[in-house]
């Protein structure tokens, strides 16, 4: 998106500039859907993206369907956010792919899928969002990492998740310092085992002694509340917030 295109969209969306706006990827289910609801409950407008996502009857929620690993989708998301609401205050890079298998079993297609969504999706959309935030001198980016970036588990080999989610954690710290003096905060949350379609309840019996120290798996609401805490903590940047029931601290 060029500067001229951005200015044109801004002029057409002048009425929406007062309301804070969150862009959330992977917004159709699990943590993403919880975040859409959580930000709306706080009065934010939301632009939600997913590969498949239904339009919302709520005028404060706009959905953009598409593969976030593709630059064209990232551009469509930003065009929609600015065109409809005039700004982006917070970007939550929630879309992600997790695939557990032995390292030597990963295929070229697996690699392309995981790195495309986990890294490419972050890269293309965050570039565009920060460009808009720099024009206004404020903004917040939240990345979703994972405990596998800090703690390997032989029962669930996931080198590509560690590679990509660990990269997001490192990029979080780097961007936080790069843009701290320009009004933009960058943080991450690192969820442990959360009850989502990716980790259904019938899989918990196999956890055994891998159950988090708090004695339960996390809920979507636990992650949502952690991200909303970061939203309300203006002095926090470069933070990797572990929402894992003590997994990292306890091992």
Q: Model segments located where?
A:
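Conserved NAD(P)H cofactor-binding loop of Rossmann-fold oxidoreductase domains
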Residues: 94-99, 245-246
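Short C-terminal tail/terminal secondary-structure segment
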Residues: 2-12, 237-251
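Substrate-binding pocket helix/loop in short-chain dehydrogenase/reductase
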Residues: 102-103, 110-112, 207-208
């Amino acid at each position: 998106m060029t500067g001229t295109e951005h200015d044109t969209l801004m002029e057409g969306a002048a009425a929406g500039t007062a309301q804070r706006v969150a862009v959330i990827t992977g917004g159709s289910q699990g943590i993403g859907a919880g975040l859409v609801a959580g930000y709306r409950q706080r009065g934010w407008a939301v632009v939600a993206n997913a590969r498949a996502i239904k339009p919302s009857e709520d005028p404060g929620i706009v959905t953009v369907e598409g593969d976030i690993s593709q630059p064209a989708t990232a551009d469509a998301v930003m065009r929609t956010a600015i065109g409809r609401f005039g700004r982006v205050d917070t970007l939550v890079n929630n879309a992600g792919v997790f695939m557990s298998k032995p390292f030597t079993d990963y295929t070229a297609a697996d690699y392309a899928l995981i790195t495309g969504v986990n890294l490419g999706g972050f890269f293309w959309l965050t570039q565009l969002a920060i460009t808009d935030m720099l024009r206004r001198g404020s903004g917040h980016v939240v990345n979703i990492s994972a405990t596998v970036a800090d703690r390997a588990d032989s029962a669930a080999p996931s080198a590509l998740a560690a590679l990509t989610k660990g990269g997001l954690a490192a990029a979080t710290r780097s961007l936080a310092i790069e843009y701290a003096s320009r009004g933009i905060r960058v943080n991450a949350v690192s969820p442990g085992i959360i009850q989502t379609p990716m980790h259904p309840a019938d899989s918990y019996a196999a956890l055994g002694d891998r159950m988090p120290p708090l004695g339960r798996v996390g809920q979507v609401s636990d992650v949502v509340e952690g991200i909303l805490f970061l939203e309300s903590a203006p002095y926090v940047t470069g933070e990797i917030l572990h929402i894992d029931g003590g997994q990292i601290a306890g091992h």
